[in-house]
Amino acid sequence: GVAPDGGSISVNSYYMELNESPFIPIMGEIHYTRIPNEQWEEQILKVKSGGVNVICTYVFWNIHEETEGVFDWDGDKDLRKFISLCQKHNMKTLVRIGPFCHGEIRNGGIPDWLYGRPFLIRTNDREYLKYVDRLYAEIASQLEGFFYKDGGCIIGIQLENELQHSAAPWAIRYPDQPIDYTVADYDVQNTKFGVSVQEQDIQSPEAGNQHMKTLKEIALSHGMEVPLYTATGWGNAAIIPQEVIPVTAAYTYPTWADIGMSPFYLFRDIHTTPDYSPVRYEGYRYPSFCAEMGVGIQMTYGRRPRIPAEAGEGLMVRSLGSGANGIGYYMYHGGITPQGKRGFFSDEPSGVPKMSYDFQAPIGEFGHTRASYHSLRIIHHFVNDFGHLLAPMGVVLPEYSDTITPSNTHTLRYAVRKKENAGFVFIT
């Protein structure tokens, strides 16, 4: 992508370039609808002060179109105001436009009024796409003038989320009936709860890839043209080969998985073998961007782990040493899930609280900073100062790296990023 001032953003198979120089994006997730709009500017500045250079945010469909045909972009839902503040403070932005988002929001962001309609959601069903087209038109009108090609701050768009990997339970269902999930009938068997490894074959992988391609075409038809398009690539999720960057994740304290020691403190070459493999793409063809690094986690009624700051710091060192050339925090700033006309928008069937979405993030739901904010900022300063050198460097692992297990606390864990006669050593 090229900006009016001659600036440029491009991507090769290993790293991103900003103005023709290697660049490592440090992306922090903050949900504007979960923070009072009067506080947006202060919180954006707080994110920036933490060393984050790209702000990411979800656009939750059901929060903006709670009643069919009536869109609300005012107050705490004023997406245009939020993006304008990012622009004011020179914060690059990546917008996750759905239609399905998850984010522990009711139905994953799909409006209640779509439940039971005679078509398949999250597919190329013609009737479903009519609603998607209308949604994207609305989002595009909010973002108009802020795209990179216009001299704006929006450098990227994420399409959908975890398509053919995960879903949210419908918050409404018929009495005494099992939970329905926000997926097409042919994807029910593929659906996982939370970010995880997909053990079985996807039933209709081409249908998923085609739907992603259609979503991109609809976005472009409404002028949402950006240098970077991303898609969640973990767990064999759908992507658009050679047209989007498949992004990865790493949660060290997942509340949806069995309790155990995390593998995400073990160095490996995640450029060739991404975390949560198998995946639907060849890793070496794409840069390794991590979109959901869980340095915190959302409390649930069933599991309430407390995550120390050292855990997040170790995860980031491991990811960079393993070849990550893009770091994305989910969440970097917590928030409070808003209330709608018929109740709270939280994903209560999944066991999350009605309101709190603190996520034990570096910046908490009330704007308070945690110890992780300060320890991670040191790493961010390193990446911002030396990322142009680090990004082109390959990964070198010790010969014994494949034999180390998460429970092994005695053997030194390290990796080297090197190019020619220079390099960096990463130790956890």
Question: What do these predicted ranges mean?
Answer:
Residues 56, 94, 158, 328-331:
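Conserved beta-strand positions in the central sheet of alpha/beta enzyme cores
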Residues 70-77, 127-131, 203-207, 306-311, ...:
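Alpha-helix N-cap and loop-to-helix initiation/capping positions
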Residues 40-113, 215-220:
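Aromatic-lined substrate-binding rim segments of carbohydrate-active enzymes
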Residues 40-42, 74-82, 139-145, 211-217, ...:
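Short alpha-helical segments and helix-capping/turn motifs at coil-helix boundaries
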Residues 32-38, 64-65, 69-74, 236-238, ...:
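Acidic-and-aromatic substrate-binding clefts and catalytic sites of carbohydrate-active enzymes
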Residues 1-54, 84:
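N-terminal carbohydrate-binding accessory modules
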Residues 129-136, 140, 150-155, 163-165, ...:
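Carbohydrate-binding surfaces of carbohydrate-active enzymes
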Residues 88-94, 101-267, 276-296, 324, ...:
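Active-site region of glycoside hydrolase catalytic domains
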